[in-house]
A protein has these predicted regions:
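N-terminal cap/lid segment of alpha/beta-hydrolase-fold proteins
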Residues: 4-50
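Active-site glycine-rich loops that stabilize anionic/oxyanionic intermediates
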Residues: 52, 59-64, 135
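Structural cue for short, hydrophobic secondary-structure segments
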Residues: 57-60, 85
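The serine-hydrolase catalytic nucleophile loop
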Residues: 62-74, 88
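Glycine-rich "HGGG/HGxG" loop immediately N-terminal to the catalytic nucleophile
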Residues: 67, 90-102
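Alpha/beta-hydrolase active-site loop
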Residues: 68, 101-122
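Conserved alpha/beta-hydrolase
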Residues: 75-95
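Primarily recognizes the serine-hydrolase "nucleophile elbow" in alpha/beta-hydrolase
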Residues: 113-160
Length: 160
């Protein structure tokens, strides 16, 4: 499911706005049939038919995508990447009960589900998908990359 985000109706621009990037609210299922909520960012200068590498950005534990993950995603989109800031299962716009559960194996799957989603976008270079994990998401991004060969690069920020 894909929806346009207008700056008047979203928290996607809490910390930083960019006139060089478009944003869309999206969602997709993980293998556990839970909806994963995300914000998809693209450079405005992309030409029709052009493919770009993509980066999945995971939020810190105790946070949601509209906080640090969106900032990293927008900044990387300004540098030419397609980016996807995700809410891990049980957090934010993603499904899962009880809320705020910590489940590393499901979180690693959320990164793989994000790679599934990005791989179906006509503007994503499928051989160029990577991940940025902030705080706790750093370990989930590394775990996902260990089992999912589609994740070609991983960067962590303040990983624990």
């Amino acid at each position: 499911m894909m929806h346009n985000i207008s700056s008047a109706q979203t928290d996607a621009d809490n910390f930083y706005r960019s006139d060089a990037v478009t944003a869309e609210k999206v969602s997709f299922p993980n293998q556990y049939k839970m909806k994963v909520g995300a914000n998809l960012f693209r450079p405005k200068e992309m030409k029709p038919g052009e493919k770009r590498p993509a980066i999945i950005v995971g939020h810190p534990m105790g946070a949601v995508k509209e906080q640090a993950a969106n900032l990293y995603a927008i900044k990387m989109a300004e540098r030419g990447f397609v980016t996807l800031a995700i809410d891990l299962s049980f957090w934010g716009d993603s499904e899962g009960e009880p809320r705020n559960t910590v489940s590393p194996e499901i979180y690693a799957e959320d990164f793989s589900a994000a790679a599934d989603f990005l791989g179906t976008r006509e503007f994503v270079e499928r051989s160029g998908i990577g991940a940025i994990g902030i705080c706790g998401s750093g370990s989930f991004a590394v775990s996902a990359a260990k089992i999912d060969p589609r994740l070609k690069a991983v960067a962590t920020v303040s990983m624990y």
